[in-house]
Amino acid sequence: KELRGALDDRFELTALALEDRVLSKLDGTEKFLFRTRDGHFIESVLIRRDGTDEGRLTVCVSSQVGCPMGCGFCQTGRIGFRRNLEPAEILDQLCLVRRLSGVRNNNVVFMGMGEPFLNYENVITAADIMNYSYGFHLSVRKITISTCGILPAIERFIDEKRPYNLAISLNDTDPVKRARYMPVEKKYPIETVASLLEKKFPVSRNRLTLEYIMRRDNISPEDARRMKRMFRHGWIKLNLIPLNRGDHGMDLPTDEEMDRFIKDLEVMNVPVSVRKSSGKDIDGACGQLSGRRYHAAGRTHRGGRA
């Protein structure tokens, strides 16, 4: 015990330290705030799909401290960009979430803070170790990397035959509206991304998902028709995400408006799924991660070194 204490005092075996931890009262989602060795803060989320430890368990990891993309509906973008995370810092999120929660997840999504494809090398290294038989031994089908549309990295990902699932944050098919909410549109237009995917993606073995945050101004019948024209092949799946509350100043759609949009897409045979927003009450859902301590009831653990 004396030796263990001396080692703990002199050496750190983890790249991150637990700063805060909070549990959703709605659905069992758990959010973790970690501190890096140089004093930055990042967040990870454990999503219990059916609210228990028995069903699908997904860990959402961050790839950057902050984010440089500035998407209007995302709290992370308001922080600005600090730096890329190292592979060890990405992997440590998974290690610590598993250790602290006592569960073994079966899915990982790179959908936390940051733009994964602006940290391409480190993200791919971390994903490879997650898949490696002497690492976490997760199936490549259980690892998903999301991007807002960094065209050169998407092409590189496909050309290198990376086996992981790919998710594109689409959110608008109208380039004018998309540029208003997603500045990346000005550099890498979604029409160009769609052309690349149409040319190269069908011959790859990857699964492609388009993520679409439903706002009140992007779920019209014309939006549905543009979606069908732009992605007219059956090898994509559209994942619809209701806009979550935040200080973005955008109007949330009603259930009736979202249902009508879903029906418009289904009539046109667009493969659609609707993502349940997990952890809304703890600011742990899509677009809500801000790298700050949570100040409300529901906390399960606070502070301490992991």
What are the residue ranges of the model-derived segments?
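Flexible, acidic/Gly-rich N-terminal and inter-domain linker regions that tether
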Residues: 1-57, 301-306
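A short, acidic, flexible beta-alpha connecting loop/helix-capping segment that sits on the rim
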Residues: 276-282
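Canonical Radical SAM [4Fe-4S] cluster-binding loop centered on the CxxxCxxC motif
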Residues: 50-89, 96
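Conserved AdoMet/S-adenosylmethionine-binding subsite of the radical SAM
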Residues: 98-107, 112-275
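C-terminal catalytic core of tyrosine-transesterase DNA break-rejoin enzymes
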Residues: 290
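Secretory/periplasmic and organellar redox-cofactor proteins
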Residues: 295-299
